[in-house]
Amino acid sequence: MPELPEVEAARRVAQRVARGRRIVDVWCADDPIVFERIPAARWRRALRGRRVRAVKRHGKHLWFELDRRPWPCMHFGMTGGFHTPGRGTLRLVAHGKKGPGLTWPPRFVKLIVKFDDGGELAFADARRLGRARLRVDPAAEPPISLLGFDAWRGLPPPASFKRLVTARSSPMKALLLDQSFAAGVGNWIADEVLYQARIDPRRRAGTLTDEEIRRLRAALARVIAVSVRARNDSDRYPRTWLFHDRWGRNPKAYTARGEKIRHDTIGGRTTAWVPSVQG
């Protein structure tokens, strides 16, 4: 699933293509799942003729601010993403591969928007787990209004962060994946943050010491900032990151530092961690 860094990269692509441009044509698939039963005709009416003022993001959700409401909101699900002609789609760093290629329109396309300068932007989703919605005020309406702080732009100050953590009793891995706590954190980022913070993913949030909470906040800020700056190129992640060696549940996996990696299911998700560091 695209996590915050990938969605931020998608937002930047969309911002570059769409900001300041007027929408001159819209093609919309008849897909009641992805579009949550909003008819294609309504999407065309809502978008055609509108000018894009900005593209915003909160967690894994993004939306387009138009010169008239409602505004389109996107969540990529497991395999969704934006495409532009001749550039394919964004690489999902968790899978280390490109999207479905450079054909246009892309396979599994759900929405194509054409702009007054000739540019185009498409939303495609192979598994149909993504969602496209129309909202009058996206940040004030579900699902975005139900999210916690944005893990990159909205990290709370230390005292507030401590209160949020100590108020919870769930295992730390489950807490980081809870979008009502920190919006945008997914599986590999949660594992990386806990590894760098030296915290056992099974620890209950309310039992963390002040020093552990300080390390947690610092690791969250660092991992998100570095991964966003890398612009979806995981080769630019530090070689000492757990990320590079965590995949595949390999029983013989070790970090670049020679630390043995263990895989467990915690909070319903496969978790890679290093007991010698996080125990």
Q: What residue ranges belong to the model's regions?
A:
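Structured catalytic/nucleic-acid-binding cores of DNA maintenance enzymes
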Residues: 1-279
